[in-house]
Amino acid sequence: MSELKTVGLFAITALAEIVGCYLPYLWLREGKSIWLLVPSALSLVAFVWLLTLHPTAVGRVYAAYGGVYVTMAILWLWAVDGIRPTTWDILGTSVALLGMAIIMFAPRNT
């Protein structure tokens, strides 16, 4: 799988997890409808399924996925919560993505 496809798959996986966790938050903290749990459950099922599509050992996938999750969470902060990321948010995201790239794309024998 190409690097671009791998990163895209990580991004879609992270979005599914964030949506799956955000909807119950809206129900519990914001008083929204309990029916939000239905799309939340579907989103989390999609998240788990998407994890199975990643092209490498599961431990490596989880470790690398963390970097993309951090990035998606900061983008969510900006797009959904309306809070502009700080310089430190961007720096931390960059470090997390660098770690993801090293884990996923470093040359290895196995």
UniProtKB/Swiss-Prot annotation:
Subcellular location: Cell inner membrane
Keyword flag Cell inner membrane: yes
Its membrane topology: Multi-pass membrane protein
Cross-referenced InterPro entries: UPF0060
Any coiled-coil regions, as ranges: none
One Pfam family matching this protein: UPF0060
GO CC, any one term: plasma membrane
UniProt keywords, alphabetically: Cell inner membrane, Cell membrane, Membrane, Transmembrane, Transmembrane helix
TM spans (from-to): 7-27, 33-53, 63-83, 87-107
Record SUPFAM superfamilies: Multidrug resistance efflux transporter EmrE (SSF103481)
HAMAP family: UPF0060 (MF_00010)
Family: Belongs to the UPF0060 family.
Protein name per UniProt: UPF0060 membrane protein Pcryo_1341
Organism, as annotated: Psychrobacter cryohalolentis (strain ATCC BAA-1226 / DSM 17306 / VKM B-2378 / K5)
